[in-house]
Amino acid sequence: YFMGNTRFGLWIFDAIRLHRRLGINVILPVLPFHGPRKAGRFSGEGFLGGSLVDTVHAEAQSVWDLRRLLGWIRALDAPSIGVHGVSLGGYNAALLAGIDDGLSCVIAGIPPVDLARLVWTHAGPTVVGSLERAGIDRDAVAELWRVVSPLAVAPKVPFARRAIYAGIGDRLVSADHPRDLWEHWGRPRIVWTQGGHDPRTSEARRLVVEM
């Protein structure tokens, strides 16, 4: 998944190198509300910042899109399919790993796994305060969003083919998020990079190639 800027997406995912050097065909789907699919002024606006139910719908649409895409790839007789997602895409990759049983590998890059926790951490007192004054606390939001949580589904990808990477200095997705996914997945391979919310570190790029 990427934000909708093709050049940026190719660079973030190292797509040209993976294709030319390793012979991997790379597909970059665009998240709902992102890039050419945006509904507001900015890419991503509305995915988390709109109605609470809209986030459920956006996640459900994301998984539907991915499964349709996987069906198309399989119809072309692809020998194997792996999924690599970054940030919110990492969340969706982790969720897909618990829904689709035909993936060869999954890599969750700098993934948040609890969107309610993420919102309560970063939304600020004005947004959080307005929700709480309306009688909506973090636990209620977490319960609503649990239907699209990667922590609510058991992974179907083989243990050795699950991997996570995260940044020890990530101030957007704090370490407790990837650590919770690591525990939920049975403690598979995890790489802690010497950086922040950045999928382009040497450690992350090496992990992708090795998987």
Residue ranges and their predicted role:
Residues 118-183:
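The feature captures the conserved acid-bearing segment of alpha/beta-hydrolase catalytic domains
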Residues 42-76:
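Alpha/beta-hydrolase active-site loop
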Residues 13, 95-99, 180:
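Active-site signature of alpha/beta-hydrolase-fold catalytic machinery across serine-
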Residues 94-140, 192:
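Hydrolase active-site cap/lid region
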Residues 179, 189-201, 205-206:
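Histidine-bearing beta->alpha loop at or near hydrolase active sites
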Residues 74-87:
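Alpha/beta-hydrolase fold nucleophile elbow
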